[in-house]
Amino acid sequence: MNIKSAEFVDRVKIFVKAGDGGNGCVSFRREKYVPKGGPDGGDGGDGGFVFLRANPSLSTLIEFVNKRKFFAENGKHGMGKKMKGRNGRDLYIDVPVGTVVKDASTGQIIADLDEPGKVVCVARGGRGGRGNAHFSTPTRQAPLIAEKGEKGEARWLELELKILADVGLVGYPNVGKSSLIARISNARPKIANYPFTTLVPNLGVVKYGDFSFVVADIPGLIEGASEGVGLGNVFLRHVERCFVIVHMLDVSGFEREDPARDYFIIREEMKKYSPFLLEKPEIVVANKIDLLEREKLPQRIKEIESSIGKEVIPISAVTGEGVDLLLDRVASIVRKERIEREERKEKKDHPMEKPAPVWRKLPERFEVEVVKEEDGQWVVEGEGLRVWMERFDLNQRDARLLILQILEKNGLEEKLKEAGVKEGDVVRIGNFEFEYRE
């Protein structure tokens, strides 16, 4: 279950774009012996949605290094005979379990995909536009108007992988974390006597009787880690998911002279990164007791316990002494935390419902602006007007009439006069131009 450094990527940015809705159709029924067929333009199909899905077979975000942009399918346009266009296919993007999804522009967390199969919608498709069959009235029996489909949502996302491990091993480099994980699990990490031997989190599955749990060796913690010194700020996020923290100290005195000082430095770095980390259950272990004279061990452990105010379990990752006691303590905490997690999950667990497609309500009231451009042409603008123009095609006669009616209701005539528009001046609305007549 080791993660090779060449393949381990735990933070990326991706762009997602949902499909646009298909346009409604302008069509009229034309059949022999049906002289008054009437409008039969069908609706456009909805655009495809974009979902992220937690896949337990993935362990890294490496797939997103070379492919960062993802697009769902657009809805198909409506057709005659009131035939609705096909909806665009939804796009499912698989990510590792434990991926936190954030809006890249705001930093807001959208979802935490912390369970296999968990799904979140990150971009909604646009609703398909209505065909002209919807616009028939007693006074407009042959409507030359249909709606354009809504644009699908688009956004940049930040994906941040937080490893799902039950136990996090923390401590200064070379205190023996990799040696311990190699002894108690199936992991075979690289072990050497120099700082930052471990460059990525090592994961190991520990089988303890009929119980099993996952342990993660969190690399690179030194003073200043929370601010980017060493590798700690890169990997501290992986501690956040652990049920229990095993804080390892070097008690031999050969490399680390003051284990108590080391303990407080690491705890301070964890606090700076997230005070929440200090609330997690913690087991403190003193490693490398095989390198210490036996008669000095009890006094050494007592001094450390007195300094940090916590019980310390003496172990040797090399010989295995004390490891069974450590595993018994760890397994007890993990069992308890898993039960509590399942109880919390049952209370809030509910299936995800697919949200409605994007469909903006057309504003009835809005501000109208008349602006004179450098070429002397007058342009009608307004946020509400923009929504109407995005919904309808001004090349369609009835669409132009409808928008002009809405503009009249919102004071277009008065705005034109206030701006100084004179008879014969050219006024533009979108891509449509007309001469002003009083």
Swiss-Prot record:
Q: Which residues form the OCT domain?
A: 358-438
Q: Note whether Cytoplasm occurs among the keywords.
A: yes
GO MF annotation terms: GTP binding; GTPase activity; magnesium ion binding
Q: Which residues form the Obg domain?
A: 6-164
Compartment annotation: Cytoplasm
* Cross-referenced InterPro entries: G_OBG, GTP-bd, GTP-bd_Obg/CgtA, GTP-bd_prot_GTP1/OBG_C_sf, GTP1-OBG_CS, GTP1_OBG_dom, GTP1_OBG_dom_sf, OBG_GTPase
Binding site residues for GTP: 171-178, 196-200, 217-220, 287-290, 316-318
Q: What is its main location?
A: cytoplasm
At which positions is Mg(2+) bound?
Answer: 178, 198
Which class of enzymes does this protein belong to?
Answer: hydrolase
Swiss-Prot/TrEMBL keywords: Cytoplasm, GTP-binding, Hydrolase, Magnesium, Metal-binding, Nucleotide-binding
Domain OBG-type G per the UniProt entry, residue ranges: 165-335
- A GO term (biological process) for this protein? ribosome biogenesis
As recorded in UniProt, its EC number(s) are 3.6.5.-
Task: Supply the Pfam families for this chain.
Answer: DUF1967, GTP1_OBG, MMR_HSR1
Say which domain of life the source belongs to: Bacteria
Q: Which GO cellular component terms are attached?
A: cytoplasm
Its family? Belongs to the TRAFAC class OBG-HflX-like GTPase superfamily. OBG GTPase family.
Subunit record text: Monomer.
> Could you tell me what this protein does?
An essential GTPase which binds GTP, GDP and possibly (p)ppGpp with moderate affinity, with high nucleotide exchange rates and a fairly low GTP hydrolysis rate. Plays a role in control of the cell cycle, stress response, ribosome biogenesis and in those bacteria that undergo differentiation, in morphogenesis control.
Protein name per its UniProtKB record: GTPase Obg
- Native organism is Thermotoga neapolitana (strain ATCC 49049 / DSM 4359 / NBRC 107923 / NS-E)
What gene is it encoded by?
obg
